[in-house]
From Swiss-Prot:
InterPro entries: NS1, NS1A, NS1A_effect_dom-like_sf, uS15_NS1_RNA-bd_sf. The keyword RNA-binding applies. It comes from Influenza A virus (strain A/Pintail/Alberta/119/1979 H4N6). The gene is NS. It comes from the Viruses. Homodimer. Interacts with host TRIM25 (via coiled coil); this interaction specifically inhibits TRIM25 multimerization and TRIM25-mediated RIGI CARD ubiquitination. Interacts with human EIF2AK2/PKR, CPSF4, IVNS1ABP and PABPN1. GO terms for biological process: symbiont-mediated suppression of host cytoplasmic pattern recognition receptor signaling pathway via inhibition of RIG-I activity; symbiont-mediated suppression of host gene expression; symbiont-mediated suppression of host mRNA processing; symbiont-mediated suppression of host PKR/eIFalpha signaling; symbiont-mediated suppression of host type I interferon-mediated signaling pathway. Residues 1-73 are annotated as: RNA-binding and homodimerization. This is Non-structural protein 1.
Amino acid sequence: MDSNTVSSFQADCFLWHVRKRFADQELGDAPFLDRPRAHQKSLRGRGSTLGLDIETATRAGKQIVERILEEESDEALKMTIASVPASRYLTDMTLEEMSRDWFMLMPKQKVAGSLCIRMDQAIMDKNIILKANFSVIFDRLETLILLRAFTEEGAIVGEISPLPSLPGHTDEDVKNAIGVLIGGLEWNDNTVRVSETLQRFAWRSCNEDWRPPLPPKQKRKMARTIESEV
């Protein structure tokens, strides 16, 4: 096993521990409080994949971080901060919407790269909006924390979340996953729209009602429908 992979996991475990302690004392704002919840599943998945115990890794990570801090001068810290591009955290969902449990009558799940797409196929003829919490850098989506599909009544009927065992995804991965989710929901005659924040940063192209361009398969389906009506 690569030593850098192990040390990276150990450092991540300790940094998660620090964030969790900070959050437990209610010292963080909403974006900060979201991160420990989202990263916990990822660490468990990585620990299982690497065969490493999280508690032991956290202790080792503490030693790594302490050693770095001992060697770090104030001037070097200022230079590091100045050279790192700042990312922004954007929220469509409240903490309650993020953490709420939901159930599917007719569950369907699909994995697309490092993202898991889930939807309830029993939902029909509903108006649905997609909301997401994510970070942005250089005016593009950097990391998706969680995306959920809501009916007008507030019920959750779909979700896109990063797989804990496969960290890392691009804005293109998210765009493709959203297309899959929209296609699945629209198959049952639901009307789906995307929040303006997500639309703006997940992809650049859009049509007049702030919807993503239809994938080729959906375009062919729509064309056949129009032809049959004519």
